[in-house]
Amino acid sequence: MLTGVTDGIFCCLLGTPPNAVGPLESVESSDGYTFVEVKPGRVLRVKHAGPAPASAAPPPLSASSDAAQGDLSGLVRCQRRITVYRNGRLLVENLGRAPRADLLHGQNGSGEPPAALEMELADPAGSDGRSAPGSGSGSGSGSGSGGRRRRARRPKRTIHIDCEKRITSCKGAQADVVLFFIHGVGGSLAIWKEQLDFFVRLGYEVVAPDLAGHGASSAPQVAAAYTFYALAEDMRAIFKRYAKKRNVLIGHSYGVSFCTFLAHEYPDLVHKVIMINGGGPTALEPSFCSIFNMPTCVLHCLSPCLAWSFLKAGFARQGAKEKQLLKEGNAFNVSSFVLRAMMSGQYWPEGDEVYHAELTVPVLLVHGMHDKFVPVEEDQRMAEILLLAFLKLIDEGSHMVMLECPETVNTLLHEFLLWEPEPSPKALPEPLPAPPEDKK
């Protein structure tokens, strides 16, 4: 009862309605949204739009290998060796030819990846999750106690990756393609409005959920409901419900972590990944010195200042247009309790450099150069550690680049969806010998 009264008071003070709790079963609402109960009492609002489903049942969530014999279009050989040393060093060796030379038109970046990349593993205890400042460019030169490091240079574990992937063009008319959009802390599916409308017009099937406590999803009043693992299981449930044969994950900020999680869990179903201002490939660890560790009542009193700070840091400009975008996108519009629980629940030690280096899915990284939350060095480091990665910088954008520059973002995303690499030389068949000439 006290919680309900408190929520009502907060609602009056903030001038926003409390998070709606949907029905206990999946139900289509009159405005085109679906309320999905991912577990008892935990209901997420989902925007599911696109072409009408085909009469045939979708393929099961399992690996499939239906490529026609002799068809080598988009076939790529993924080969790399990942070595973790006991002294905290990481060595990534690219043994094959990754299709980085086949860059998208207008792409920032250059040619082939280095044959080997060596870096220091980030210390989770000293990091602040994805929103923390960059921890360096990941060069191979370490500092201090070089001799002791060399003596301790013994492999702790070695991971070998050797597989073939078929990366094909994802077109809107293809019934086996689904685009998943996952927002970050404080947002809602409304931040994707321009992207959802754009891709639905092109014939794509799109799925965009509200995270728990955000938008119109249910908002449990228990902090444990907002840990990374709890939210990741929500996204797993949504993915398993709507996934088809070729699925593309698009994440923004904290939402990138859930895309990475799903790509790691379902490598045969995730066809491509797009990371927008997601940060570096470091394990998530909440900061104990963060302002979000203050009591909920204090955070509520500071909410006007936090909203203004988000506007200053999240947008390249702070005019009337940006304020309207912030309001329409329902960004940074959650209760103080949910905000505090979300920030303190960002604990994911498994999501380190090794975890990201194991991904074999092609990734497009989009970064707004005016972003004050995520330094460009973090996305550059992410591009270095991933096997198949393209980094695109948008000069006029910031953290909320999909709201600021929707046409540019839509074009980049669409080009990446249509991109298909040339087959790897190792995947090509040996040329047939020329027939002998007839002697006359």
Curated annotation (Swiss-Prot):
Organism this protein belongs to: Macaca fascicularis (Crab-eating macaque)
Q: Gene3D superfamilies from the entry? A: alpha/beta hydrolase
Q: Where is the active site?
A: S253 (charge relay system), D371 (charge relay system), H399 (charge relay system)
Name of the protein: Protein ABHD8
Assembly and partners are described as:
Interacts with NLRP3 (via NACHT and LLR domains); this interaction is enhanced in the presence of NLRP3 inflammasome inducers, such as ATP, nigericin, silica, or alum. Interacts with ZDHHC12.
Q: Which UniProt keywords apply?
A: Cytoplasm, Hydrolase, Inflammatory response
Biased composition regions of type Low complexity, renumbered to the chain? 124-134
Primary location: cytoplasm
What EC class is this?
A: hydrolase
Task: List all Basic residues biased stretches.
Answer: 147-158
Residues covered by the AB hydrolase-1 domain: 178-280
For this chain, the family text in UniProt reads:
Belongs to the AB hydrolase superfamily.
Q: What cellular component GO annotations does this protein have?
A: cytoplasm; mitochondrion
Has the keyword Acetylation been applied to this entry? no
> Localized where?
Cytoplasm
Annotated region (Disordered), positions in chain: 123-158
The organism that produces this protein has a lineage beginning with:
Eukaryota, Metazoa, Chordata, Craniata, Vertebrata
* Function description: Negatively regulates NLRP3-driven inflammation. Promotes NLRP3 degradation through the chaperone-mediated autophagy (CMA) pathway, hence attenuating inflammasome activation and IL1B secretion. Acts by recruiting palmitoyltransferase ZDHHC12 to NLRP3, facilitating NLRP3 palmitoylation and subsequent degradation.
